[in-house]
Swiss-Prot record:
Classification via CDD domains: ADH_SDR_c_like (cd05323)
GO terms for MF: alcohol dehydrogenase (NAD+) activity; aldehyde dehydrogenase (NAD+) activity; protein homodimerization activity
Enzyme class (EC, first level): oxidoreductase
One of the GO BP terms on file: NADH metabolic process
UniProt record similarity statement: Belongs to the short-chain dehydrogenases/reductases (SDR) family.
Assembly information from the UniProt record: Homodimer.
Transferase is among the record's keywords: no
Positions bound to NAD(+): 12-35
Reactions catalysed according to its record: a primary alcohol + NAD(+) = an aldehyde + NADH + H(+); a secondary alcohol + NAD(+) = a ketone + NADH + H(+)
GO cellular component, one term: cytosol
Protein name (Swiss-Prot/TrEMBL): Alcohol dehydrogenase
Superkingdom as given in the UniProt entry: Eukaryota
Active-site residue list: 153 (proton acceptor)
Length: 256
């Protein structure tokens, strides 16, 4: 179902990162009512730039680390909902790429995403009288086929795809729809230098960047297109400047 971002309220976790900041710039061009950015480190210059792009959009920043206990996330969301009354879209975009940091990679890329999603369901779940909402989770093409030198990172992204696909199937119960956007290799600081698992490939970043990549701007443009297409359960691939819906193969069914 096509979705217009005009006059909508959007929460963007990690909306000041490489792909995140360029996506935030595209979002404010769509005449949002509010863009609420949750990120670990404040960037006043970036916030000012977003406000300058479209002064009609209210851009707000709150410090947020996705690895905090879920109770802290719920407290922050309560503050945001009290201010805005309604939130239309949650974008979960926090991510790190460093297979030296096993626990933190899992905590940021997967557990934090699950906890933030779980927390917002308290406000959105129609079983609790909520209005429903839209969740856009940022995965990666490595969630389809791993970069085998970074199996921890790739594994977290596969988990994001699976979790989000389950959320989408639960929409008739919760009223909350969900989909993933899965960027290919994008030229950001995330991929300029990173560590492989157990140092199996010390030059993994250099070798990866020797192959075709995309700019964060082209990725961001397709990111927002995916949000506007608003297809529950979609698994979007954003690679080399293109946007493509992935058809997932079913090899097993729980039967329930």
């Amino acid at each position: 179902m096509a979705f217009t971002l005009t006059n909508k309220n959007v929460i963007f976790v990690a909306g000041l990162g490489g792909i995140g900041l360029d996506t935030s710039k595209e979002l404010v061009k769509r005449d949002l009512k509010n863009l609420v950015i949750l990120d670990r480190i404040e960037n006043p210059a970036a916030i000012a730039e977003l406000k300058a792009i479209n002064p009609k959009v209210t851009v707000t920043f709150y410090p947020y680390d996705v690895t905090v206990p879920i109770a802290e996330t719920s407290k922050l969301l309560k503050t945001i909902f009290a201010k805005l009354t309604t939130v239309d879209v949650l974008i979960n975009g926090a991510g790190i790429l460093d297979d030296y940091q096993i626990e933190r990679t899992i905590a940021v890329n997967y557990t934090g995403l699950v906890n933030t999603t779980t927390a917002i369901l308290d406000f959105w779940d129609k079983r609790k009288g909520g209005p429903g909402g839209i969740i856009c989770n940022i995965g990666s093409v490595t969630g389809f086929n791993a970069i085998y030198q970074v199996p921890v990172y790739s594994g977290t992204k596969a988990a994001v795809v699976n979790f989000t696909s389950s959320l989408a199937k639960l929409a008739p119960i919760t009223g909350v729809t969900a989909y993933t956007v899965n960027p290919g290799i994008t030229r950001t600081t995330l991929v300029h230098k990173f560590n492989s698992w157990l140092d199996v490939e010390p030059q993994v970043a250099e070798k990866l960047l020797a192959h075709p990549t995309q700019t964060s701007l082209s990725c961001a443009e397709n990111f927002v297109k995916a949000i506007e297409l608003n297809e529950n359960g979609a698994i979007w691939k954003l690679d080399l400047g293109t946007l493509e819906a992935i058809q997932w193969s079913k090899h097993w069914d729980s039967g329930i």
